[in-house]
A protein has these predicted regions:
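A binding-site-centric feature that preferentially detects glycan-recognition modules on secreted/surface proteins
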Residues: 1-138, 145-223
């Protein structure tokens, strides 16, 4: 399976990523994060993503920190749009890592070689997961996807966004919810509201559906 992502979006070094998270007011002990980022940098390849475990920072605490330029003249004038979770996903934190996306038992870890999965546009999650695992890759979780957008907002582009199928919700009966989380840009319609046009959003798609503008994000592994 070939893997692609936006060639213009490059992750900064882990120490710079740590400073970005600190600047957002997310970190109780900045020096501890700096030390851990420095340690992880010696054990991971360039282009890796620094992530705080979702037990520390769940998706509901991160989504509103995403930012994208407002569309049109407003964006040219410096106006930005704040991220949000769609109104019919109040259970966003119930979407947890699956057996295909096992997280390290650490508050801070690294995702190696995250890719947006552009080559899987028009694939359903059900079709994409076997191809990912056959290629030795692991699907990104929602929290990992949000971290990626916090570090490199340009990874969410018009007509080139992505699903994070490493996160699923388990129903009380043990079955998996048929929704799968995704990150894309609001069109400002419906319950999103016109004021959110152009904003990065956490939403969901059906497990069996295909979308021409949504890739299936994956990684080489986690450390």
């Amino acid at each position: 399976m070939s893997v692609s992502t936006s060639p213009t979006v490059v992750l900064p070094p882990l120490d710079a990523q740590a400073e970005r998270l600190i600047s957002l007011g997310l970190i109780a002990d900045p020096d501890a994060l700096r030390a851990e980022a420095s340690r992880l940098a010696t054990a991971t390849p360039e282009g890796s993503l620094l992530v705080l475990h979702e037990r520390v920072l769940p998706a509901s605490k991160l989504a509103h920190l995403m930012r994208l330029p407002a569309p049109g003249r407003a964006g040219a004038a410096g106006e930005v749009r704040e991220g949000f979770v769609v109104e019919d996903m109040t259970d966003v934190d119930d979407f947890r890592p699956t057996a295909h996306a096992v997280l390290p038992d650490a508050d801070v870890y690294v995702v190696a070689d995250p890719t947006r999965g552009d080559e899987m546009r028009s694939w359903s999650p059900a079709e994409a997961l076997p191809a990912m695992t056959d290629a030795g890759r692991t699907p990104l979780t929602l929290v990992e996807g949000i971290h990626w957008a916090l570090q490199t907002p340009g990874i969410i582009e018009a007509n080139a966004c992505f699903m994070t199928i490493g996160s699923r919700k388990t129903k009380p009966n043990g079955d998996l919810d048929t929704r799968t989380p995704a990150l894309w840009i609001s069109s400002g319609t419906g319950r999103d509201g016109r004021a959110r046009k152009g904003a990065p959003k956490v939403g969901w798609c059906w497990w069996g559906n295909r979308h021409t503008w949504l890739g299936l994000a994956s990684a080489a592994g986690r450390v």
